[in-house]
Amino acid sequence: MRTMHCFLFILLFCLGQVFTDVIFTSERCNRVTYGLRTVNGDPSRYKQCGPSGRVWIVPCAPQMTFDPEDRVCKERLDSRIVKPMRKYETSRTIITTPAPIPSSYPVSAEVIAPGAPAASHAAPEEFVFSTIRPKSRKPKAKTRGKFRKTTTAMIQTTTPMTVESFESMEMTTTPKIVIFASKKNMNNTNRSGESRTQLIRNRNRERGNAPAFTRPGRVRTTTPMSVTHATRFVPGIQHKVTVAPKEVQGMPHTLAPYEKMDRRPDSFGVEELTTMTPEYTVRYNGQTMTENEFLNQLLHIVQHQKTVSERQQQEKFEKMEQERLRQEKEEKARELERRRKLEESETARQAELDRQATIYAEQERMAMERNRELERIRLEEKKRENERVRQEEIAMEISKIRELERLQLERQRKNERVRQELEAARKYKLQEEERQRKIQQQKVEMEQIRQQEEARQEQLRVLEEERARELERVRQEELERQHQMEILRQQEEDQKKKKLEKDREQREQQEAEELNRMIIEKEMKENKQKMIEEKNKRKMLEKEMEDRQNAIYEEEERRIAEEERRKQIEIEERRRIQQQIMIATEERSRLDAMEREREMLRQIKESEKQRKELERQELLATTPITTIKPIYRPDISEYRPPDVESHMIRFTTQSPEWATPSPTWNPAWNTVTAEEETPGIPIIHSQCQVNGECELKYDVDSFCAHPRSPSMYLQCAPLYGRLGRWTERYCPDTLIFIVSIGRCEKGEETRKPYDPDNRVVIPRLPSETSFVEWKGNRVIDHQLPTHISPPRVYPPVPETHQPQIYSTIDQFPKDLLPKIPELATAEKTYAQQYQNHIHGSVVSGGHNHQVVRPIAPTPTIAPNSNVPVSYQISQSQNSLSTNSIKSEIDLSHIHPLFPRVQPDFLSRMLPSLNFKMHDENSGAQSLGSVVKPVLKKIALNQTEQFLDRLLADQKNDEKLRKETIDRLKSSNSDNITKKN
């Protein structure tokens, strides 16, 4: 009985309106990787993975099919090729009678109500069996009420129906499908169930059609109920459902998945008896029948509905084809009329064009004559201009030759001066040799004096020994005297006068000896002081000789270096002149080539215009008129895509922003004691796609070279989980991304020398909201008017004035200045004399002994000097500027504002700096007080060539100063020796 109810539910769903046609399968799937897939044999459906991890078969919207390439449902292009969508109609009335089916029943004929509209005839019909689990059973009264609402009333009859009654039913307004039940099914009871199943298979094989659905072949697992009675029956006469030839000519079937199944024909004779094993019988609509008999009737209903639907569909397609042919005929007639009108208008337009062509030809001839005259005038002007340029070049060459001759003459004069200096040096060398000979004689005399001093020292030693012996003798006598006084104490009174006299004589003798000793010590000190003075004098003479020799060597080296530099300057000047000539020649050739290209482009445009005009005329004359069928596209208001697609999952977030702290966040720099976190070594990839997927690393960054721009790079930004996306990042200005080190750096080929006028933009800390711009060693103040500085000139030949480097060093911090050695007192005196002799500067008071640095005059600039912009003097180089920064700075050139990739010189420099970054007593400090010393340190470390070039003058001045000091020292030493 339970099985009977299940099939009753299936029948009601087939005949009633289908609430849902989504098929839920038991196939497992992965929602992440499954996506949308096609259904074999049914283009109007597609598969997707449901929320429970099972495959769903979902239909597209009406009149749409699933595109396997784009993975989306699209409108059907041609209804004749793609099968129409299913149309769900209300179920028809089912009549069951026990009468046999007559042989004259027109199965293939249409069952259409005469009064039904034409639109309902062409609508196809289909039954969709869903695999949704049926709901639990409810009370019988409610179930009947529900069925009564969803299905039409079942007309029951107990009398056999004849052919006449069936024909009368065909003429009614409501078409009804009649199912006949044979009375012979009660006669045969000896035939087994297996033989009956074999007969059913033979009948299906003869018919050549498979059943609409698979028969239930499950094995009973419950205990069968007791058999009430055995039945003998003959199945009803099932005629083969015939289909007209028109209906099988490639038309789409309703149930595509069932077309490829093996259909077994049914072969039931009219008089054949079927013997079955005892089965359970049910009473349905007043009839007692078995389960298999009920299923056979249901199968017949489905086959009949399918045949009727195919016939209606075929007629609908025929009407559509006739309508299409009629529209094509009308369209062709309209097209012929339109072509006739176009030909008439084209004839009139061609006549007008011929009339205009004559006028245009005359105007073109006059324009060509005018252009030829203008071209002749232009050629004459160009010839005069070329002659003028040639004369200027000749004059320039003559001036350059004269300049070279002047330089040659000056060089000869300098060589003569050098020769004279060498001659003077040779004479000075001879004098020096004579002086050396005199010094040797003085050394011999000093050796003799030293020997005499040694002899005198020996005599002093002997005298000292004699004095010591005398003192010992006096001490012995004193002891003896005391002993006598101890013995002769009683006789003291008698010998008092004698003792007093003797004591007086002894005191006088001791005073005389002490006086002699003091005289000897004084003479020894005087001799020692004389020896020390002579030794110091000898050392001073040796030092002066060594300094003089070094000065001669340095002078020779300076002359050699000066000659090499002069040669190099001449070579550079000659190369510069050749380059200017070459550049002028290339510029003239480039202008001529541009003029030729411009003329060629004008001719090409004219020929292209004429060719297009000819092609357009030929196209209008020869192109046949084609008919373009309009494509139906719904209006925007009618068709809007769904907000959320059912086949994809979207993770929507806000636009990515760089997290920056609040403006009030200002941590104390001196309280941070934790060590900085050392980031891991970044991973560098290659051949990455922009916005492509990447594997996100939590501990290190992943970078990749940009496929197009070297000033950009790709960073793996987090998407969700371990999945990331390659996001474009911009390096700061003047930097490029170097793949080998994974940082934004200056390339070796593009690295430029230090330029004090170059502006560098450095981002502030996250707590600050602007940028700091540096120019040289100063912060640029945008609030003050900036002055345009004249060009900075650094002459290659050392000049006599003080070098320009002092004005730059005065602005540097004291601890970063180069170590300049201090002069001794005598050397300061010589340096002051030299400075007064050369510059005429005023020396400060003698109490401080400081050298006054002369102010360097501003060098004059030649009117035609080719001085690069990077070597230009700044008038405001000594002006003070503050840290105030304009807030209207364009931040679009730095993406992101605080990149993870920092320049290499900052990463090397900042950790190694050892200075106090914050002072408790100074209050809040700006970024300039922290970064400015860093940039000064960087400037000194990065600009060795620049400083060498600026310090060249100072080095030469130092050499000249040493030479002058040596000469003054030598003259003073000569005067001292002469006096001695």
Swiss-Prot record:
Signal peptide per UniProt: 1-20
Superkingdom assignment: Eukaryota
Residues bearing glycans: N187, N190, N941, N975
Annotated region (Disordered), positions in chain: 310-354, 431-451, 486-512
Keyword Oxidoreductase: no
Pfam family, one: DUF5401
Protein keywords: Glycoprotein, Signal
PANTHER family: DYNACTIN 1-RELATED MICROTUBULE-BINDING (PTHR18916), RESTIN HOMOLOG (PTHR18916:SF93)
Protein name, as recorded: Chitin binding domain containing chtb-2
Organism: Caenorhabditis elegans
Lineage: Eukaryota, Metazoa, Ecdysozoa, Nematoda, Chromadorea
